[in-house]
């Protein structure tokens, strides 16, 4: 079978890591995938499409014919961090890590990739998402190599700085950067976080109804992790007549349901929305940027 990477992966790697690094990894990827499969004695069924934004995911069969998913990511995406987080969670709220191939691939339990929380009505999806993410917030393993929220957001803040002078994004960028400074000055917690938690990152499973996938793990406070979930289905929010009030209610309801400070969640939601918006501007995705900036302006 062909192992051509989905276009979403091609675009995302180029945007995140640069076209040169992406091309150098994607070029030999089909042959590399065959090598990983052969070394692990796995039979490929199909490539998951549209798939993820940082890895190639194949649905496979193990030597005993049991189903699994094989995830192959470039070294610069630090797949060992995902491995360490999944191993620490050991299936609690997240997909279970079954094995690691000699070539660095992650062999994961097979979930239902076609069924995510985005398939549920909004209220039900948010309820299930909150119940899932709370399981992931545990003490990190001793001697871990995960970066902190302060470290990750410092890099992001540096990339946002030029947008202070932008005639349309300048005020929101300044507000987001100020919110970050205040939040990291008084860190609230130091727990293991998913890092990119949203409805699309929670898939249906057999062992449990819903399990998280695709972590970009780091250590810090829960409000940072929840902030990305607040803006889920942003295109629907922006298109609704009561979008602004709905967004603010969502912040309050999620904060209250998970016993966290509303203002810290609001601050991280603002920062993460504006950070994503400025990144979209840099990549030339103006429509995405406008949606994110309008959402951020409501907070």
PLM feature segments, named:
Residues 1-46:
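Juxta-kinase regulatory segment immediately upstream of eukaryotic protein kinase catalytic domains
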Residues 2-11, 115-171, 217-221:
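A cross-family kinase active-site recognition segment
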Residues 25-33, 37, 141-195, 205-207, ...:
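An alpha-helical support segment within catalytic cores of ATP-dependent transferases
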């Amino acid at each position: 079978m062909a192992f051509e990477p989905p276009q979403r992966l091609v675009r995302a790697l180029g945007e995140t890591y640069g076209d040169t690094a992406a091309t150098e990894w994607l070029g030999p990827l089909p042959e590399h995938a065959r090598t990983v499969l052969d070394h692990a004695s796995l039979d490929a069924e199909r490539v998951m499409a549209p798939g993820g934004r940082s890895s190639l995911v194949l649905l496979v069969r193990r030597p005993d014919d049991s189903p699994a998913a094989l995830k192959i990511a470039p070294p610069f995406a630090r797949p060992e961090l995902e491995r360490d987080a999944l191993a620490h969670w050991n299936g609690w709220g997240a997909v279970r890590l079954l094995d690691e191939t000699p070539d660095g691939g992650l062999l994961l339990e097979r979930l239902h990739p076609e069924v995510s929380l985005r398939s549920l009505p909004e209220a039900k999806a948010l309820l299930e998402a909150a119940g899932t993410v709370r399981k992931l917030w545990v003490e990190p393993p001793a001697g871990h190599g995960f970066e902190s929220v302060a470290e990750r957001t410092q890099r992001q803040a540096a990339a946002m700085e030029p947008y202070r002078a932008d005639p349309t994004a300048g005020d929101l960028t300044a507000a987001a950067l100020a919110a970050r400074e205040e939040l990291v000055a008084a860190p609230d917690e130091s727990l293991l976080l998913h890092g990119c938690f949203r409805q699309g990152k929670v898939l249906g499973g057999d062992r449990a109804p819903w399990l998280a996938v695709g972590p970009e793990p780091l250590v810090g406070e829960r409000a940072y992790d929840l902030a990305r979930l607040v803006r889920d289905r942003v295109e629907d929010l922006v298109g609704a007549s009561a979008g602004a009030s709905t967004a603010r209610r969502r912040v309050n309801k999620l904060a209250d349901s998970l016993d966290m400070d509303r203002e810290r969640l609001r601050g991280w939601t603002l920062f993460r929305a504006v950070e994503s918006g400025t990144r979209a501007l840099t990549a030339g995705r103006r429509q995405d940027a406008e949606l994110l900036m309008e959402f951020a302006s409501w907070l």
